[in-house]
């Protein structure tokens, strides 16, 4: 299981991304608009750079909801392969059966 600090750090990043999403989108739109003057676009880029680093969506990392594991993550189920195997073996995921041939 991942350290609790790492899980909490990721939750904090998710909150920051949600908080600044609208502001970041507006600044990006201004900065990428070719019809605006160059100076205004540059100021928008500077304001974008002043936002917290963790408010960017690219800083997020997918983690398992049960264990916090960052690798081997299934997006559809939001759990890792290990948690999937454990839940599948316990019969808690409908339609998932162990294959045998």
From Swiss-Prot:
Source organism (scientific name): Dinoroseobacter shibae (strain DSM 16493 / NCIMB 14021 / DFL 12)
Q: What is this protein called?
A: Small ribosomal subunit protein uS14
How does this protein assemble?
Part of the 30S ribosomal subunit. Contacts proteins S3 and S10.
GO BP of this protein: translation
Classification via SUPFAM superfamilies: Glucocorticoid receptor-like (DNA-binding domain) (SSF57716)
A single GO molecular-function term is: structural constituent of ribosome
A Pfam cross-reference name:
Ribosomal_S14
Question: What are the leading ranks of the lineage?
Answer: Bacteria, Pseudomonadati, Pseudomonadota, Alphaproteobacteria, Rhodobacterales
Q: Which Gene3D superfamilies match?
A: 1.10.287.1480
Kindly state one GO CC term assigned in the UniProt record. Answer: cytoplasm
What is the purpose of this protein?
Binds 16S rRNA, required for the assembly of 30S particles and may also be responsible for determining the conformation of the 16S rRNA at the A site.
Q: Which family does it belong to?
A: Belongs to the universal ribosomal protein uS14 family.
């Amino acid at each position: 299981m991942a350290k609790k600090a790492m899980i909490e750090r990721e939750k904090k990043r998710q909150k920051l991304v949600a908080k600044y999403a609208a502001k970041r989108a507006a600044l990006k739109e201004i900065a990428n608009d070719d019809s605006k003057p160059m100076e205004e676009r540059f100021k928008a880029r500077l304001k974008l750079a002043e936002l917290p680093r963790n408010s960017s969506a690219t800083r997020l990392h997918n983690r398992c909801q049960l264990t916090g594991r960052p690798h081997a993550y299934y997006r559809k189920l939001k759990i890792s392969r290990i948690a999937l195997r454990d839940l599948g073996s316990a019969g808690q995921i409908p339609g998932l059966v162990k294959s045998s041939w």
